[in-house]
Amino acid sequence: MKVNPNNIELIISAVKEDQYPETELSEVALSGRSNVGKSTFINSMIGRKNMARTSQQPGKTQTLNFYNIDEQLIFVDVPGYGYAKVSKTQREKFGKMIEEYITKRENLQLVIQLVDLRHDPTQDDILMYNYLKHFDIPTLVICTKEDKIPKGKVQKHIKNIKTQLDMDPDDTIVSYSSIQNNKQQQIWNLIEPYIS
């Protein structure tokens, strides 16, 4: 699958169902804890530096951001979870917004769950993965920040994450580095069956 990086736009930032875009395109949602690198991942996948706004401040994305990717699919950037400085009320609001999207949106075909390859999955990562499995949502786990791990230890870290998430054998896990930028095609190939 090839995408034209010049044909990508943020369609809408939504907080509730009646704001979701009316479209026939399949949607791929990106979930992960705050600061796992969702925006950086989107930018590197589409070959654009600042399409999805990256921030040094975790918990910055507070809406569901719908990006039309070359009229082929829509990436939905979901607010990061597990950020301590977001108030309890705000966290509950995010939770409801994410739940409404994941359980009601028929266009949703796949969730890419991003986890940090350097660390064990957090309790929130495990809860999110189990939540997706509970609703039978196809899930692709991407382990970010691969460049921060010595090459010889990458497989060990992947195996650890797979075990701790108690991953469904049908789900795929891939390590990724937005800096090395060498696995986009592999990931597009994994996404493609869900959107065609």
From Swiss-Prot:
<feature type="binding site">
    <location>
        <begin position="144"/>
        <end position="147"/>
    </location>
    <ligand>
        <name>GTP</name>
    </ligand>
</feature>
<feature type="binding site">
    <location>
        <begin position="59"/>
        <end position="63"/>
    </location>
    <ligand>
        <name>GTP</name>
    </ligand>
</feature>
<keyword id="KW-0342">GTP-binding</keyword>
<keyword id="KW-0131">Cell cycle</keyword>
<keyword id="KW-0132">Cell division</keyword>
<feature type="domain" description="EngB-type G">
    <location>
        <begin position="24"/>
        <end position="196"/>
    </location>
</feature>
<dbReference type="GO" id="GO:0046872">
    <property type="term" value="F:metal ion binding"/>
</dbReference>
<keyword id="KW-0717">Septation</keyword>
<dbReference type="GO" id="GO:0005829">
    <property type="term" value="C:cytosol"/>
</dbReference>
<feature type="binding site">
    <location>
        <begin position="176"/>
        <end position="178"/>
    </location>
    <ligand>
        <name>GTP</name>
    </ligand>
</feature>
<dbReference type="Pfam" id="PF01926">
    <property type="entry name" value="MMR_HSR1"/>
</dbReference>
<dbReference type="GO" id="GO:0000917">
    <property type="term" value="P:division septum assembly"/>
</dbReference>
<dbReference type="InterPro" id="IPR030393">
    <property type="entry name" value="G_ENGB_dom"/>
</dbReference>
<protein>
    <recommendedName>
        <fullName>Probable GTP-binding protein EngB</fullName>
    </recommendedName>
</protein>
<keyword id="KW-0479">Metal-binding</keyword>
<keyword id="KW-0460">Magnesium</keyword>
<keyword id="KW-0547">Nucleotide-binding</keyword>
<comment type="similarity">
    <text>Belongs to the TRAFAC class TrmE-Era-EngA-EngB-Septin-like GTPase superfamily. EngB GTPase family.</text>
</comment>
<dbReference type="GO" id="GO:0005525">
    <property type="term" value="F:GTP binding"/>
</dbReference>
<comment type="function">
    <text>Necessary for normal cell division and for the maintenance of normal septation.</text>
</comment>
<feature type="binding site">
    <location>
        <begin position="77"/>
        <end position="80"/>
    </location>
    <ligand>
        <name>GTP</name>
    </ligand>
</feature>
<dbReference type="InterPro" id="IPR006073">
    <property type="entry name" value="GTP-bd"/>
</dbReference>
<feature type="binding site">
    <location>
        <begin position="32"/>
        <end position="39"/>
    </location>
    <ligand>
        <name>GTP</name>
    </ligand>
</feature>
<dbReference type="InterPro" id="IPR019987">
    <property type="entry name" value="GTP-bd_ribosome_bio_YsxC"/>
</dbReference>
<feature type="binding site">
    <location>
        <position position="61"/>
    </location>
    <ligand>
        <name>Mg(2+)</name>
    </ligand>
</feature>
<dbReference type="InterPro" id="IPR027417">
    <property type="entry name" value="P-loop_NTPase"/>
</dbReference>
<feature type="binding site">
    <location>
        <position position="39"/>
    </location>
    <ligand>
        <name>Mg(2+)</name>
    </ligand>
</feature>
